[in-house]
Amino acid sequence: MLIYPKIYLENATKISEKIIKENNIKGIILDVDNTLLYYNREMLENVDIWCNNLKEKGIKFCIVSNSNKKDKIKMIAEKLKIPYISFGMKPLKFGLKKAQRILKLDS
């Protein structure tokens, strides 16, 4: 079984409180490459502020990356103070289901 995103936006920080409320979102699973990091490997501008603001509103976060570079994923997760899963094997469900359990979210 494959799992696909339900919402597509320009970048992660475009997920607004309005979108979260309209879609009853309780948690956000993020990728690293081209989601939290730009193509040039710099962190997406203001992603830490965006993440902290939503965490204050009760939104849970987890990084699920297909990368096997655990140190890179861990560094980003620690900066954002969120859990992470490296080598998540997306679009297969294993890493995403693990993130769902970590965040204690229903399917």
What are the roles of these predicted feature ranges?
Residues 1-30:
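Non-catalytic pre-domain segments flanking phosphatase-related domains
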Residues 28-30, 35-42, 47-74, 89:
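Substrate-recognition element of Asp-dependent hydrolases with the DxDx(T/V) motif
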Residues 3-10, 67-107:
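Substrate-recognition "cap/lid" segment bordering the active-site pocket of phosphatases
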Residues 15, 46, 95-98:
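Well-ordered alpha-helical segments embedded in enzymatic catalytic cores
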